[in-house]
Amino acid sequence: MTILTQSTTWQALAAHSHQIPHMRELFAGDPARFSNMSLSTCGLFLDYSKNRATPETLNLLQTLAQEAKLDAKIKAMFAGDIINTTEKRAVLHTALRSTAEQSIVAEGQDIVPEVQQTLNKMQQFVTSVTSGQWKGFTGKAITDIVSIGIGGSFLGPKIVSQALRPYWITGLNCHFVANVDGTSISEKLKLLDPETTLFIMSSKSFGTQETLTNTLTAKAWFLAKGGSQSDVAKHFVAVTSNVAKATDFGIDADNIFPMWDWVGGRYSLWSAIGLPIALLIGMDNFRSLLKGAHQMDTHFANAPLAENMPVIMGLFSLWYGNFFNAQSHVVLTYDHYLRGLPAYFQQLDMESNGKSVTLNGTHVDYSTGPVIWGGEGTNGQHAYHQLLHQGNALIPADFIMPLQSHNPIGEHHDQLASNCFGQTQALMQGRTLDEALAELSKSSLSDEEKLLIAKHKVMPGNKPSNTLLMDKLTPETLGALIALYEHRTFVQGAIWDINSFDQWGVELGKSLGNDVLARIGAEQDATALDASSNGLINLYRQGKI
Protein backbone atom coordinates (compact mmCIF):
# COMPACT_ATOMS: atom_id res chain seq x y z
CA MET A 1 0.00 0.00 0.00
CA THR A 2 1.09 3.58 -0.62
CA ILE A 3 1.35 6.19 2.10
CA LEU A 4 -1.90 7.73 0.88
CA THR A 5 -4.01 4.58 1.14
CA GLN A 6 -2.41 3.64 4.46
CA SER A 7 -3.50 6.89 6.10
CA THR A 8 -6.22 6.76 8.73
CA THR A 9 -8.15 9.46 6.89
CA TRP A 10 -8.20 7.42 3.69
CA GLN A 11 -9.42 4.40 5.65
CA ALA A 12 -12.06 6.55 7.35
CA LEU A 13 -13.29 7.82 3.99
CA ALA A 14 -13.49 4.25 2.69
CA ALA A 15 -15.69 3.25 5.63
CA HIS A 16 -17.69 6.47 5.48
CA SER A 17 -18.54 5.95 1.79
CA HIS A 18 -20.81 3.05 2.80
CA GLN A 19 -22.66 5.05 5.46
CA ILE A 20 -24.02 8.02 3.51
CA PRO A 21 -27.81 8.10 3.11
CA HIS A 22 -29.50 8.57 -0.26
CA MET A 23 -29.47 12.20 -1.33
CA ARG A 24 -33.26 12.24 -1.09
CA GLU A 25 -32.87 11.77 2.65
CA LEU A 26 -30.09 14.34 2.87
CA PHE A 27 -32.26 17.01 1.25
CA ALA A 28 -35.32 16.05 3.28
CA GLY A 29 -33.33 16.29 6.50
CA ASP A 30 -31.68 19.65 5.78
CA PRO A 31 -33.80 22.49 4.33
CA ALA A 32 -30.67 24.66 4.25
CA ARG A 33 -28.60 22.14 2.27
CA PHE A 34 -28.56 24.29 -0.89
CA SER A 35 -27.37 27.43 0.90
CA ASN A 36 -24.90 25.46 3.02
CA MET A 37 -23.40 23.70 0.01
CA SER A 38 -23.08 26.43 -2.57
CA LEU A 39 -20.43 29.03 -3.22
CA SER A 40 -20.01 32.14 -5.35
CA THR A 41 -16.71 33.65 -6.53
CA CYS A 42 -15.14 35.24 -9.61
CA GLY A 43 -18.49 35.56 -11.37
CA LEU A 44 -19.26 31.85 -10.95
CA PHE A 45 -21.80 30.13 -8.70
CA LEU A 46 -21.26 26.51 -7.68
CA ASP A 47 -24.08 24.37 -6.31
CA TYR A 48 -22.47 21.23 -4.90
CA SER A 49 -25.43 20.18 -2.75
CA LYS A 50 -26.34 17.32 -5.10
CA ASN A 51 -23.33 15.27 -4.04
CA ARG A 52 -23.14 12.17 -1.87
CA ALA A 53 -21.78 14.15 1.03
CA THR A 54 -22.47 15.17 4.59
CA PRO A 55 -20.52 17.65 6.75
CA GLU A 56 -18.44 14.67 7.90
CA THR A 57 -17.59 13.85 4.28
CA LEU A 58 -16.35 17.37 3.66
CA ASN A 59 -14.33 17.39 6.87
CA LEU A 60 -12.65 14.09 6.00
CA LEU A 61 -11.86 15.19 2.44
CA GLN A 62 -10.40 18.46 3.69
CA THR A 63 -8.32 16.55 6.24
CA LEU A 64 -7.01 14.34 3.44
CA ALA A 65 -6.03 17.49 1.52
CA GLN A 66 -4.28 18.91 4.57
CA GLU A 67 -2.37 15.68 5.14
CA ALA A 68 -1.28 15.78 1.49
CA LYS A 69 0.06 19.30 2.19
CA LEU A 70 -2.18 20.79 -0.48
CA ASP A 71 -1.75 24.32 0.87
CA ALA A 72 2.03 24.07 0.61
CA LYS A 73 1.82 22.59 -2.89
CA ILE A 74 -0.41 25.43 -4.06
CA LYS A 75 2.06 27.95 -2.68
CA ALA A 76 4.94 26.10 -4.35
CA MET A 77 3.27 26.32 -7.75
CA PHE A 78 2.56 30.04 -7.49
CA ALA A 79 6.08 30.68 -6.15
CA GLY A 80 7.72 29.13 -9.19
CA ASP A 81 9.20 26.11 -7.43
CA ILE A 82 10.24 23.17 -9.60
CA ILE A 83 7.06 21.11 -9.20
CA ASN A 84 7.33 19.45 -12.64
CA THR A 85 10.08 17.28 -11.23
CA THR A 86 10.58 14.89 -14.15
CA GLU A 87 11.32 17.76 -16.54
CA LYS A 88 12.84 20.01 -13.86
CA ARG A 89 10.53 22.90 -14.64
CA ALA A 90 8.46 25.43 -12.79
CA VAL A 91 4.73 25.53 -13.58
CA LEU A 92 3.73 29.14 -14.06
CA HIS A 93 0.86 29.45 -16.50
CA THR A 94 -0.64 31.60 -13.74
CA ALA A 95 2.07 34.19 -14.45
CA LEU A 96 0.61 34.67 -17.93
CA ARG A 97 -2.44 36.32 -16.40
CA SER A 98 -0.62 38.13 -13.59
CA THR A 99 -0.76 41.90 -13.19
CA ALA A 100 2.12 44.13 -14.23
CA GLU A 101 2.71 45.05 -10.58
CA GLN A 102 3.46 41.48 -9.53
CA SER A 103 6.90 39.92 -9.28
CA ILE A 104 7.20 36.21 -10.09
CA VAL A 105 10.61 34.59 -10.24
CA ALA A 106 11.46 31.60 -12.44
CA GLU A 107 14.97 30.37 -13.12
CA GLY A 108 16.37 33.26 -11.12
CA GLN A 109 14.64 36.13 -12.87
CA ASP A 110 11.38 38.03 -12.69
CA ILE A 111 9.30 36.79 -15.61
CA VAL A 112 6.45 39.30 -15.35
CA PRO A 113 8.18 41.99 -17.47
CA GLU A 114 8.68 39.50 -20.32
CA VAL A 115 5.04 38.41 -20.08
CA GLN A 116 3.92 42.03 -20.25
CA GLN A 117 6.26 42.74 -23.18
CA THR A 118 4.72 39.81 -25.05
CA LEU A 119 1.21 41.09 -24.38
CA ASN A 120 2.22 44.50 -25.68
CA LYS A 121 3.75 42.89 -28.77
CA MET A 122 0.50 40.97 -29.29
CA GLN A 123 -1.38 44.25 -28.95
CA GLN A 124 0.70 45.87 -31.70
CA PHE A 125 0.32 42.84 -33.96
CA VAL A 126 -3.43 42.57 -33.46
CA THR A 127 -3.88 46.28 -34.12
CA SER A 128 -1.77 46.06 -37.27
CA VAL A 129 -3.75 43.14 -38.69
CA THR A 130 -7.25 44.22 -37.67
CA SER A 131 -6.77 47.82 -38.80
CA GLY A 132 -5.73 46.71 -42.27
CA GLN A 133 -2.24 48.17 -41.84
CA TRP A 134 -0.72 44.69 -42.29
CA LYS A 135 -0.77 43.93 -46.00
CA GLY A 136 -0.33 40.72 -47.92
CA PHE A 137 2.04 40.31 -50.85
CA THR A 138 -0.34 42.03 -53.29
CA GLY A 139 -1.14 44.91 -50.96
CA LYS A 140 -4.48 43.59 -49.74
CA ALA A 141 -5.49 43.51 -46.07
CA ILE A 142 -5.79 40.22 -44.20
CA THR A 143 -9.25 38.66 -44.06
CA ASP A 144 -8.53 35.10 -42.87
CA ILE A 145 -6.34 33.62 -40.15
CA VAL A 146 -5.24 29.98 -40.21
CA SER A 147 -4.02 28.75 -36.82
CA ILE A 148 -1.81 25.66 -37.14
CA GLY A 149 -0.99 23.76 -33.95
CA ILE A 150 -1.73 20.54 -32.08
CA GLY A 151 -2.86 19.68 -28.56
CA GLY A 152 -3.00 22.77 -26.37
CA SER A 153 -1.80 24.97 -29.21
CA PHE A 154 -4.96 23.97 -31.08
CA LEU A 155 -7.68 23.12 -28.57
CA GLY A 156 -7.33 26.18 -26.35
CA PRO A 157 -7.48 28.83 -29.08
CA LYS A 158 -10.18 27.00 -31.03
CA ILE A 159 -12.54 26.35 -28.14
CA VAL A 160 -12.12 29.76 -26.52
CA SER A 161 -12.67 31.45 -29.88
CA GLN A 162 -15.79 29.34 -30.39
CA ALA A 163 -17.05 30.14 -26.89
CA LEU A 164 -16.55 33.88 -27.36
CA ARG A 165 -18.26 34.08 -30.76
CA PRO A 166 -20.52 36.93 -29.53
CA TYR A 167 -17.36 39.00 -28.96
CA TRP A 168 -15.88 38.66 -32.45
CA ILE A 169 -15.48 42.33 -33.25
CA THR A 170 -12.60 42.50 -35.72
CA GLY A 171 -14.27 41.15 -38.86
CA LEU A 172 -11.65 38.44 -39.40
CA ASN A 173 -12.34 34.77 -40.07
CA CYS A 174 -10.28 32.11 -38.32
CA HIS A 175 -9.66 28.50 -39.33
CA PHE A 176 -7.98 25.91 -37.11
CA VAL A 177 -5.81 23.07 -38.39
CA ALA A 178 -4.34 20.35 -36.17
CA ASN A 179 -4.73 16.83 -37.54
CA VAL A 180 -1.94 15.60 -39.81
CA ASP A 181 -4.63 14.02 -42.01
CA GLY A 182 -4.20 15.93 -45.27
CA THR A 183 -7.95 16.25 -45.63
CA SER A 184 -8.06 18.70 -42.72
CA ILE A 185 -5.81 21.34 -44.21
CA SER A 186 -6.92 20.67 -47.80
CA GLU A 187 -10.53 21.45 -47.00
CA LYS A 188 -9.47 24.69 -45.29
CA LEU A 189 -7.21 25.84 -48.12
CA LYS A 190 -10.00 25.38 -50.66
CA LEU A 191 -11.83 28.24 -48.97
CA LEU A 192 -8.94 30.70 -48.84
CA ASP A 193 -7.32 33.42 -50.92
CA PRO A 194 -3.51 33.39 -50.53
CA GLU A 195 -3.41 37.16 -50.99
CA THR A 196 -5.45 37.77 -47.81
CA THR A 197 -4.57 34.78 -45.61
CA LEU A 198 -2.23 34.86 -42.61
CA PHE A 199 -0.91 31.64 -41.05
CA ILE A 200 0.04 31.33 -37.37
CA MET A 201 2.34 28.37 -36.70
CA SER A 202 2.45 27.37 -33.01
CA SER A 203 5.12 24.89 -31.96
CA LYS A 204 7.63 25.29 -29.15
CA SER A 205 10.31 23.43 -31.13
CA PHE A 206 9.11 24.47 -34.60
CA GLY A 207 9.37 20.76 -35.27
CA THR A 208 6.22 19.10 -33.94
CA GLN A 209 5.43 16.58 -36.66
CA GLU A 210 1.79 17.42 -37.32
CA THR A 211 2.28 21.17 -37.03
CA LEU A 212 5.39 21.32 -39.20
CA THR A 213 3.85 19.07 -41.85
CA ASN A 214 0.73 21.24 -42.07
CA THR A 215 2.81 24.43 -42.12
CA LEU A 216 4.99 23.13 -44.95
CA THR A 217 1.83 22.21 -46.87
CA ALA A 218 0.47 25.71 -46.29
CA LYS A 219 3.72 27.23 -47.51
CA ALA A 220 3.74 25.04 -50.64
CA TRP A 221 0.14 26.11 -51.36
CA PHE A 222 1.07 29.75 -50.87
CA LEU A 223 4.07 29.52 -53.22
CA ALA A 224 2.02 27.63 -55.81
CA LYS A 225 -0.64 30.35 -55.73
CA GLY A 226 1.72 33.17 -56.66
CA GLY A 227 3.58 34.02 -53.49
CA SER A 228 7.38 34.02 -53.39
CA GLN A 229 9.84 33.02 -50.67
CA SER A 230 10.36 36.69 -49.85
CA ASP A 231 6.58 37.08 -49.45
CA VAL A 232 6.40 34.36 -46.78
CA ALA A 233 7.13 36.90 -44.05
CA LYS A 234 3.92 38.77 -44.92
CA HIS A 235 1.76 35.68 -44.54
CA PHE A 236 3.37 33.55 -41.81
CA VAL A 237 4.06 34.28 -38.14
CA ALA A 238 5.15 31.87 -35.42
CA VAL A 239 4.78 31.20 -31.72
CA THR A 240 7.90 29.22 -30.88
CA SER A 241 11.08 28.97 -28.83
CA ASN A 242 13.14 28.06 -31.89
CA VAL A 243 13.76 31.41 -33.53
CA ALA A 244 16.46 30.02 -35.83
CA LYS A 245 14.17 27.43 -37.43
CA ALA A 246 11.38 29.96 -37.81
CA THR A 247 13.61 32.49 -39.57
CA ASP A 248 15.05 29.78 -41.81
CA PHE A 249 11.46 29.01 -42.82
CA GLY A 250 11.05 32.62 -43.90
CA ILE A 251 9.33 34.19 -40.92
CA ASP A 252 10.50 37.66 -39.91
CA ALA A 253 12.17 37.62 -36.49
CA ASP A 254 9.93 40.52 -35.46
CA ASN A 255 6.90 38.30 -36.04
CA ILE A 256 8.02 35.47 -33.78
CA PHE A 257 6.34 35.29 -30.39
CA PRO A 258 7.93 33.45 -27.44
CA MET A 259 7.02 30.24 -25.65
CA TRP A 260 8.50 29.35 -22.28
CA ASP A 261 9.46 26.06 -20.65
CA TRP A 262 7.45 26.97 -17.56
CA VAL A 263 4.18 26.84 -19.56
CA GLY A 264 2.80 23.46 -20.61
CA GLY A 265 0.92 23.21 -23.89
CA ARG A 266 -2.44 22.45 -22.29
CA TYR A 267 -2.08 25.59 -20.15
CA SER A 268 -0.84 27.88 -22.92
CA LEU A 269 -3.91 29.65 -24.34
CA TRP A 270 -3.15 32.59 -22.04
CA SER A 271 0.15 33.21 -23.85
CA ALA A 272 0.87 34.21 -27.45
CA ILE A 273 -0.67 30.82 -28.32
CA GLY A 274 -3.88 32.80 -27.81
CA LEU A 275 -3.12 35.09 -30.77
CA PRO A 276 -6.03 33.67 -32.81
CA ILE A 277 -8.37 34.52 -29.93
CA ALA A 278 -7.04 38.07 -29.71
CA LEU A 279 -7.31 38.55 -33.47
CA LEU A 280 -11.01 37.67 -33.28
CA ILE A 281 -12.12 39.38 -30.07
CA GLY A 282 -9.53 42.16 -29.79
CA MET A 283 -6.90 42.66 -27.12
CA ASP A 284 -9.20 44.39 -24.64
CA ASN A 285 -11.41 41.33 -24.54
CA PHE A 286 -8.36 39.05 -24.45
CA ARG A 287 -7.11 40.95 -21.40
CA SER A 288 -10.54 40.46 -19.82
CA LEU A 289 -10.12 36.72 -20.38
CA LEU A 290 -6.80 36.92 -18.52
CA LYS A 291 -8.40 39.03 -15.79
CA GLY A 292 -11.05 36.41 -15.08
CA ALA A 293 -8.42 33.69 -14.85
CA HIS A 294 -6.29 35.86 -12.56
CA GLN A 295 -9.26 36.38 -10.25
CA MET A 296 -9.66 32.61 -9.97
CA ASP A 297 -5.91 32.26 -9.34
CA THR A 298 -6.20 34.72 -6.46
CA HIS A 299 -9.18 32.86 -5.04
CA PHE A 300 -7.41 29.49 -5.34
CA ALA A 301 -4.24 30.79 -3.71
CA ASN A 302 -5.94 32.47 -0.76
CA ALA A 303 -9.35 30.96 0.04
CA PRO A 304 -9.56 28.43 2.89
CA LEU A 305 -9.99 24.85 1.73
CA ALA A 306 -13.61 24.74 2.89
CA GLU A 307 -14.47 27.80 0.77
CA ASN A 308 -12.16 27.16 -2.17
CA MET A 309 -14.07 26.36 -5.37
CA PRO A 310 -11.32 24.44 -7.22
CA VAL A 311 -10.51 22.50 -4.05
CA ILE A 312 -14.14 21.53 -3.47
CA MET A 313 -14.56 20.33 -7.06
CA GLY A 314 -11.25 18.48 -7.04
CA LEU A 315 -12.05 16.73 -3.76
CA PHE A 316 -15.43 15.54 -4.99
CA SER A 317 -13.91 14.13 -8.17
CA LEU A 318 -11.35 12.26 -6.07
CA TRP A 319 -14.11 11.12 -3.71
CA TYR A 320 -16.03 9.37 -6.47
CA GLY A 321 -13.02 8.01 -8.31
CA ASN A 322 -11.30 6.54 -5.29
CA PHE A 323 -14.19 5.51 -3.06
CA PHE A 324 -17.08 4.78 -5.46
CA ASN A 325 -15.08 3.37 -8.40
CA ALA A 326 -16.28 6.11 -10.76
CA GLN A 327 -14.22 5.65 -13.92
CA SER A 328 -15.47 8.67 -15.83
CA HIS A 329 -16.75 12.20 -15.30
CA VAL A 330 -19.17 13.96 -17.66
CA VAL A 331 -19.20 17.70 -18.43
CA LEU A 332 -22.54 18.98 -19.76
CA THR A 333 -22.64 22.52 -21.12
CA TYR A 334 -26.07 24.08 -21.41
CA ASP A 335 -24.87 26.79 -23.77
CA HIS A 336 -24.16 26.28 -27.47
CA TYR A 337 -21.09 28.52 -27.36
CA LEU A 338 -19.56 26.29 -24.67
CA ARG A 339 -20.08 23.06 -26.61
CA GLY A 340 -16.33 22.56 -27.05
CA LEU A 341 -15.45 22.76 -23.35
CA PRO A 342 -15.79 19.00 -22.65
CA ALA A 343 -13.06 18.28 -25.22
CA TYR A 344 -10.85 21.00 -23.74
CA PHE A 345 -11.32 19.75 -20.19
CA GLN A 346 -10.74 16.21 -21.46
CA GLN A 347 -7.24 17.09 -22.60
CA LEU A 348 -6.57 19.20 -19.52
CA ASP A 349 -7.50 16.49 -17.04
CA MET A 350 -6.55 13.28 -18.83
CA GLU A 351 -3.16 14.45 -20.09
CA SER A 352 -2.40 15.90 -16.66
CA ASN A 353 -3.61 13.13 -14.38
CA GLY A 354 -3.42 10.03 -16.55
CA LYS A 355 -0.48 8.79 -14.48
CA SER A 356 0.26 5.60 -12.56
CA VAL A 357 3.33 6.37 -10.44
CA THR A 358 3.88 8.85 -7.63
CA LEU A 359 6.53 11.56 -7.72
CA ASN A 360 9.07 9.15 -6.24
CA GLY A 361 8.26 6.43 -8.78
CA THR A 362 6.07 4.22 -6.59
CA HIS A 363 3.25 2.53 -8.48
CA VAL A 364 -0.09 3.84 -7.21
CA ASP A 365 -2.67 1.50 -5.71
CA TYR A 366 -5.61 3.83 -6.33
CA SER A 367 -7.37 5.25 -9.37
CA THR A 368 -6.04 8.51 -10.78
CA GLY A 369 -7.38 10.44 -13.75
CA PRO A 370 -10.91 9.48 -14.86
CA VAL A 371 -12.16 9.57 -18.44
CA ILE A 372 -13.55 13.06 -19.09
CA TRP A 373 -16.28 13.33 -21.69
CA GLY A 374 -19.50 15.17 -22.40
CA GLY A 375 -21.37 17.44 -24.75
CA GLU A 376 -23.96 20.18 -24.94
CA GLY A 377 -27.43 20.16 -23.50
CA THR A 378 -30.08 19.39 -24.46
CA ASN A 379 -28.67 17.17 -27.22
CA GLY A 380 -27.14 14.73 -24.77
CA GLN A 381 -30.49 14.15 -23.09
CA HIS A 382 -31.56 12.28 -26.20
CA ALA A 383 -28.41 10.17 -26.25
CA TYR A 384 -26.12 9.32 -23.35
CA HIS A 385 -28.19 10.74 -20.48
CA GLN A 386 -30.00 7.40 -20.51
CA LEU A 387 -26.78 5.81 -19.25
CA LEU A 388 -26.43 8.48 -16.57
CA HIS A 389 -29.92 7.84 -15.24
CA GLN A 390 -30.25 4.05 -15.44
CA GLY A 391 -26.81 2.63 -16.19
CA ASN A 392 -25.04 0.70 -13.45
CA ALA A 393 -21.87 2.83 -13.52
CA LEU A 394 -21.59 5.87 -11.28
CA ILE A 395 -20.76 8.88 -13.47
CA PRO A 396 -20.49 12.22 -11.65
CA ALA A 397 -21.63 15.17 -13.76
CA ASP A 398 -20.90 18.88 -14.05
CA PHE A 399 -23.68 21.05 -15.48
CA ILE A 400 -22.56 24.46 -16.76
CA MET A 401 -24.98 27.22 -17.79
CA PRO A 402 -25.18 31.02 -18.07
CA LEU A 403 -28.30 32.54 -16.54
CA GLN A 404 -28.62 34.98 -19.44
CA SER A 405 -28.41 34.10 -23.12
CA HIS A 406 -26.65 36.11 -25.81
CA ASN A 407 -29.61 35.20 -28.02
CA PRO A 408 -32.79 35.60 -25.93
CA ILE A 409 -35.37 34.30 -28.40
CA GLY A 410 -38.85 33.53 -27.09
CA GLU A 411 -38.80 30.80 -24.45
CA HIS A 412 -35.64 29.11 -25.73
CA HIS A 413 -33.52 29.93 -22.71
CA ASP A 414 -36.29 29.19 -20.21
CA GLN A 415 -36.64 25.75 -21.75
CA LEU A 416 -32.88 25.24 -21.75
CA ALA A 417 -32.63 26.17 -18.07
CA SER A 418 -35.58 23.99 -17.12
CA ASN A 419 -33.95 21.03 -18.82
CA CYS A 420 -30.63 21.69 -17.10
CA PHE A 421 -32.11 21.96 -13.62
CA GLY A 422 -34.56 19.14 -14.29
CA GLN A 423 -31.73 16.80 -15.22
CA THR A 424 -29.82 17.51 -12.01
CA GLN A 425 -32.99 16.92 -10.01
CA ALA A 426 -33.75 13.67 -11.82
CA LEU A 427 -30.21 12.37 -11.32
CA MET A 428 -30.39 13.14 -7.62
CA GLN A 429 -33.98 12.09 -6.94
CA GLY A 430 -34.56 9.22 -9.34
CA ARG A 431 -37.88 7.38 -9.41
CA THR A 432 -38.90 4.65 -6.97
CA LEU A 433 -40.92 1.56 -7.86
CA ASP A 434 -43.93 2.94 -5.98
CA GLU A 435 -43.72 6.21 -7.92
CA ALA A 436 -43.48 4.34 -11.21
CA LEU A 437 -46.51 2.22 -10.27
CA ALA A 438 -48.47 5.33 -9.31
CA GLU A 439 -47.78 6.86 -12.73
CA LEU A 440 -49.20 3.71 -14.34
CA SER A 441 -52.21 3.42 -12.06
CA LYS A 442 -54.69 4.81 -14.58
CA SER A 443 -53.38 2.84 -17.55
CA SER A 444 -55.31 -0.07 -19.05
CA LEU A 445 -52.45 -2.48 -18.40
CA SER A 446 -52.93 -5.50 -16.19
CA ASP A 447 -51.38 -5.43 -12.73
CA GLU A 448 -48.70 -7.84 -13.91
CA GLU A 449 -47.88 -5.63 -16.90
CA LYS A 450 -47.86 -2.51 -14.72
CA LEU A 451 -45.33 -4.09 -12.38
CA LEU A 452 -43.10 -5.15 -15.23
CA ILE A 453 -43.15 -1.72 -16.90
CA ALA A 454 -42.70 0.00 -13.54
CA LYS A 455 -39.51 -1.95 -12.92
CA HIS A 456 -38.15 -0.65 -16.21
CA LYS A 457 -39.08 2.91 -15.24
CA VAL A 458 -37.29 2.82 -11.89
CA MET A 459 -34.28 5.11 -11.63
CA PRO A 460 -32.10 4.77 -8.56
CA GLY A 461 -31.19 8.44 -8.32
CA ASN A 462 -28.42 9.36 -5.90
CA LYS A 463 -26.32 10.27 -8.96
CA PRO A 464 -24.01 13.17 -8.05
CA SER A 465 -23.69 16.43 -9.93
CA ASN A 466 -22.31 19.94 -9.61
CA THR A 467 -24.06 22.90 -11.21
CA LEU A 468 -21.96 25.87 -12.30
CA LEU A 469 -23.76 29.09 -13.20
CA MET A 470 -22.67 32.52 -14.38
CA ASP A 471 -24.69 35.65 -15.07
CA LYS A 472 -23.64 35.70 -18.72
CA LEU A 473 -20.86 34.17 -20.77
CA THR A 474 -18.18 36.86 -21.10
CA PRO A 475 -14.42 36.77 -21.64
CA GLU A 476 -13.98 37.34 -17.92
CA THR A 477 -16.31 34.58 -16.74
CA LEU A 478 -14.87 32.17 -19.31
CA GLY A 479 -11.36 32.92 -18.05
CA ALA A 480 -12.45 32.17 -14.50
CA LEU A 481 -14.21 28.96 -15.58
CA ILE A 482 -11.18 27.55 -17.41
CA ALA A 483 -8.83 28.49 -14.56
CA LEU A 484 -11.24 26.77 -12.16
CA TYR A 485 -10.84 23.49 -14.03
CA GLU A 486 -7.06 23.94 -14.29
CA HIS A 487 -6.82 24.25 -10.52
CA ARG A 488 -9.35 21.47 -9.91
CA THR A 489 -7.02 19.22 -11.94
CA PHE A 490 -4.04 20.37 -9.87
CA VAL A 491 -5.83 19.58 -6.60
CA GLN A 492 -6.38 15.96 -7.56
CA GLY A 493 -2.81 15.46 -8.77
CA ALA A 494 -1.41 17.05 -5.62
CA ILE A 495 -3.34 14.69 -3.35
CA TRP A 496 -2.54 11.67 -5.52
CA ASP A 497 1.14 12.71 -5.37
CA ILE A 498 1.59 12.48 -9.13
CA ASN A 499 3.15 14.85 -11.65
CA SER A 500 0.27 16.60 -13.41
CA PHE A 501 2.60 18.51 -15.72
CA ASP A 502 4.47 15.97 -17.84
CA GLN A 503 3.10 13.69 -20.57
CA TRP A 504 5.47 10.82 -21.24
CA GLY A 505 2.71 8.75 -22.81
CA VAL A 506 2.38 11.38 -25.51
CA GLU A 507 6.14 11.41 -26.04
CA LEU A 508 6.29 7.62 -26.49
CA GLY A 509 3.59 7.75 -29.13
CA LYS A 510 5.53 10.42 -31.02
CA SER A 511 8.79 8.46 -31.06
CA LEU A 512 7.17 5.18 -32.13
CA GLY A 513 5.21 7.01 -34.81
CA ASN A 514 8.43 8.38 -36.27
CA ASP A 515 9.93 4.87 -36.29
CA VAL A 516 6.89 3.48 -38.11
CA LEU A 517 7.03 6.35 -40.62
CA ALA A 518 10.59 5.39 -41.51
CA ARG A 519 9.53 1.78 -42.05
CA ILE A 520 6.60 2.83 -44.24
CA GLY A 521 9.04 4.67 -46.48
CA ALA A 522 11.58 1.83 -46.61
CA GLU A 523 12.16 -0.20 -49.77
CA GLN A 524 11.57 -3.57 -48.13
CA ASP A 525 8.62 -5.00 -46.21
CA ALA A 526 8.59 -4.45 -42.46
CA THR A 527 9.87 -7.46 -40.50
CA ALA A 528 11.56 -6.06 -37.40
CA LEU A 529 8.52 -5.20 -35.29
CA ASP A 530 5.80 -7.36 -33.76
CA ALA A 531 3.71 -9.41 -36.18
CA SER A 532 0.69 -7.11 -35.97
CA SER A 533 2.66 -3.89 -36.59
CA ASN A 534 4.61 -5.51 -39.43
CA GLY A 535 1.37 -6.73 -41.01
CA LEU A 536 -0.36 -3.36 -40.77
CA ILE A 537 2.63 -1.50 -42.23
CA ASN A 538 2.88 -3.91 -45.13
CA LEU A 539 -0.85 -3.67 -45.87
CA TYR A 540 -0.53 0.10 -45.91
CA ARG A 541 2.40 -0.10 -48.32
CA GLN A 542 0.31 -2.27 -50.64
CA GLY A 543 -2.48 0.29 -50.55
CA LYS A 544 -5.22 -2.30 -50.45
CA ILE A 545 -6.55 -5.08 -48.23
UniProtKB/Swiss-Prot annotation:
Top-level lineage group: Bacteria
Active site per the UniProt annotation: 351 (proton donor), 382, 510
Gene3D superfamilies recorded: 1.10.1390.10, Glucose-6-phosphate isomerase like protein, domain 1 (3.40.50.10490)
Stretches assigned to coiled coil: none
UniProt entry tagged with the keyword Cytoplasm: yes
One of the Pfam families matching this protein, by short name: PGI
GO molecular function: carbohydrate derivative binding; glucose-6-phosphate isomerase activity; monosaccharide binding
Cysteines engaged in disulfide bonds, as pairs: none
Pathway participation: Carbohydrate biosynthesis; gluconeogenesis; Carbohydrate degradation; glycolysis; D-glyceraldehyde 3-phosphate and glycerone phosphate from D-glucose: step 2/4
Keywords: Cytoplasm, Gluconeogenesis, Glycolysis, Isomerase
A GO CC term attached to the entry: cytosol
UniProt-listed Enzyme Commission number(s): 5.3.1.9
Enzyme class: isomerase
Catalytic activity: alpha-D-glucose 6-phosphate = beta-D-fructose 6-phosphate
Similarity remark: Belongs to the GPI family.
Name this polypeptide is given: Glucose-6-phosphate isomerase
Source organism (scientific name): Shewanella sp. (strain MR-7)
Gene: pgi
